[in-house]
Amino acid sequence: YAMTLSESANSIDKGMAAVVAAETNLSDVRGELGELIYCGYNINDLAENATFEEVVHLLHRGHLPNTEELDNLKAEFVANRNLPEGLIDVLKALPKDTSPMHALRTGVSALGCFDPEAETNDNLEAVRRKSIKLIAQVPVIVAAFHRLRQDKDILESDSNLGEASNFIWLITGNKPSEDMERTMDICYILHADHGFNASTF
């Protein structure tokens, strides 16, 4: 409920229409126009011309990366893909019929137990590092659980592949075609940010 003060009396408005929880410059969903904007860029332009890694940099830094910035970000993703062995044990302990979303939630929660910076939320660079780590590790968790529930070996990430390609590799055990890679990359871009979730405040 949102409480507003009118000239005559207090009133209680149902719903969230009058509630401002926070403001963001990261993305803007313009539903009436059918537009999604990331940091001033139309999602259609980004999906057509950018990579997922470039979009992550845009969302983290507010601008598209130059070559050096992009190379550094890619290296950071590759360096953070490995899962702690204890987390693999947690995934192996889950029943095979566990919902993949429940397995992912459990995996992400367990990651916090292995992260020495888990409680560091007052330092923007530490939060950014944790974000990069999660972006790199979430697909690995999903792929690992997918393969475990099919009695298949968990595959090692390929440092020569980008985030979208590596995910396909980890799931299938096959290097993706250019079309598969681009399709997954676009999916990643479209889901990179979608406004402010009511469930987060």
Name the predicted role of every residue range:
Residues 2-201:
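Hydrophobic alpha-helical bundle cores within soluble ligand-binding/oligomerization subdomains
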